[in-house]
Amino acid sequence: MIMEALVALLRFPFYSFGKQSYQVRQSLLLPSPSALKGALAKGIILLGGKKGKSLDEIAKKTVEELENKLIYVGAKPYKSSIIKTPILLKRLRNLEDQKNPEKSDAMRREYVFAREILAIYVFRRKLSEEEKDLMLKAVYLIDQLGDTECVGNVIKTEWVEVKEEKAPLKTYVKFKKVSKMSINGGIIENMLETPNFGNKVKEEPYLLPLIEKRYRRSSYYVESDRIFDGNYKIIAFDEVIGLWI
């Protein structure tokens, strides 16, 4: 089976992928599969050619078609550590068409600082040149992941070959796939696998090949080579990246 991966180098000043909670929202360390799929699907829609009765219908159909082509979606930090910090957000509602608009609400939310990350899209089969060109153009249209707070831009992107060779795991994997393996560290986080479009979608636990370190009172997260080896690998932007597919 010949597989290829589209790898995009994304740059953010900061981002926040909120966990399911109320008022105090912690952030995931890395963008979830649902955020990555949704961002690529948005790019495909912007390029046109999709029809439907509503934008939600078009988006849902586009995501379904995309998921049929993908076998893996993930992300990793690119030559940088990950740092969390709490920021108080005050969301104003100045545009409400009411004589007595509701008071603005405030909530505490974590933001993550990781200068650059790699978004990895692995396709089940080798795509045609036309399909590859469409995906490439769609990736370059990514300007945010998930919420509007996660504004970023694509620096560069490339297609790479997926090789069935062992290499240290560098990007997250569903925990149930590797739960019986000998795992040396890592961090477990619950993430959405697919955009929910208003429906209740259960979060899945994922293993992130990161370790926590401390400097004085602050915590930061770095990659680890000792979690375990992935069963596939790619080489992208001068990095050898182990995957578990």
UniProtKB/Swiss-Prot annotation:
One of its GO terms (biological process) is defense response to virus. The keyword Iron does not apply. CDD domains: Cas5_I-A. Keywords: Antiviral defense. It holds the Pfam family Cas_Cas5d. InterPro entries: CRISPR-assoc_prot_Cas5 (IPR021124), CRISPR-assoc_prot_Cas5_N (IPR013422), CRISPR-assoc_prot_Cas5a-typ (IPR010153), CRISPR_Cas5_sf (IPR053725). Belongs to the CRISPR-associated protein Cas5 family. Subtype I-A/Apern subfamily. CRISPR (clustered regularly interspaced short palindromic repeat) is an adaptive immune system that provides protection against mobile genetic elements (viruses, transposable elements and conjugative plasmids). CRISPR clusters contain spacers, sequences complementary to antecedent mobile elements, and target invading nucleic acids. CRISPR clusters are transcribed and processed into CRISPR RNA (crRNA). NCBIfam families: cas_cas5a, CRISPR_cas5. This is CRISPR-associated protein Cas5. It comes from Methanocaldococcus jannaschii (strain ATCC 43067 / DSM 2661 / JAL-1 / JCM 10045 / NBRC 100440). The lineage of its organism: Archaea, Methanobacteriati, Methanobacteriota, Methanomada group, Methanococci. The gene is cas5.
